[in-house]
């Protein structure tokens, strides 16, 4: 899979922290996020899913993710926003790849992307969460165009 290395700025994000099988929690988290953003007129810039665990190593019921929108620095969570958290996605160097997701199969492009990054002789994965940025509304369009981000650092040597 083709990808590029990009320097990303830290993002301020607001949304929901979810624990459990991603095929359930990501969908549920985005449903909650949409209701919150629409109901409070939140000025959302980007829609992201942030992944903290390796599904090959962590049991499905313990997988952690955040479903969030980027907001301006200094954003204040409005009253009556139960469960909403304000946090950051770290900046730094990231491998970035694009994919079109059909039939809700987000795993295949991620596995392809990880395989490509693991084979890279100049870059290695850094110990930071991965995330994906949504470029369209897949519920309306029937597919999702996404950008996938894996934190990287130069290999020693």
UniProtKB/Swiss-Prot annotation:
GO cellular component, one term: cytoplasm
Entry keyword Ubl conjugation: no
InterPro entries: AraC_E-bd, DNA_gyrase_inhibitor, DNA_gyrase_inhibitor_GyrI, GyrI-like, Reg_factor_effector_dom_sf
The entry's keywords: Cytoplasm, Stress response
Compartments where located: Cytoplasm
Single annotated GO MF: DNA topoisomerase type II (double strand cut, ATP-hydrolyzing) inhibitor activity
Alphabetical list of Pfam families matching this protein: GyrI-like (PF06445)
Keyword ATP-binding in annotation: no
Domain of life: Bacteria
Main location: cytoplasm
SUPFAM superfamilies the UniProt entry points to: Probable bacterial effector-binding domain
Family, similarity comment: Belongs to the DNA gyrase inhibitor family.
Quaternary structure annotation from Swiss-Prot or TrEMBL: Interacts with DNA gyrase.
Function: Inhibits the supercoiling activity of DNA gyrase. Acts by inhibiting DNA gyrase at an early step, prior to (or at the step of) binding of DNA by the gyrase. It protects cells against toxins that target DNA gyrase, by inhibiting activity of these toxins and reducing the formation of lethal double-strand breaks in the cell.
Family annotation (PANTHER family): DNA GYRASE INHIBITOR (PTHR40055:SF2), TRANSCRIPTIONAL REGULATOR YGIV-RELATED (PTHR40055)
Protein name (Swiss-Prot/TrEMBL): DNA gyrase inhibitor
Species in which this protein is naturally found: Enterobacter lignolyticus (strain SCF1)
């Amino acid at each position: 899979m083709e990808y590029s290395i990009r320097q990303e700025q830290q993002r301020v994000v607001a949304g929901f922290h979810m624990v459990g099988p991603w095929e359930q929690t990501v969908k549920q988290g985005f449903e909650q996020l949409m209701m919150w953003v629409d109901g409070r007129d939140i000025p959302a810039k980007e829609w992201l899913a942030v992944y903290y665990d390796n599904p090959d190593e962590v049991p499905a019921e313990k997988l952690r993710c955040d479903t969030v929108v980027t907001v301006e620095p200094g954003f204040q969570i409005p009253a009556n926003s139960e469960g909403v958290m304000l946090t950051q996605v770290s900046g730094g160097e990231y491998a970035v790849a694009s994919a079109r997701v059909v039939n809700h199969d987000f795993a295949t492009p991620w596995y392809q992307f990880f395989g490509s990054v693991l084979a890279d002789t100049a870059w290695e994965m850094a110990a930071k969460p991965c995330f994906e940025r949504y470029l369209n509304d897949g519920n309306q369009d029937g597919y999702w165009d996404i950008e996938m981000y894996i934190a990287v650092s130069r290999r020693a040597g």
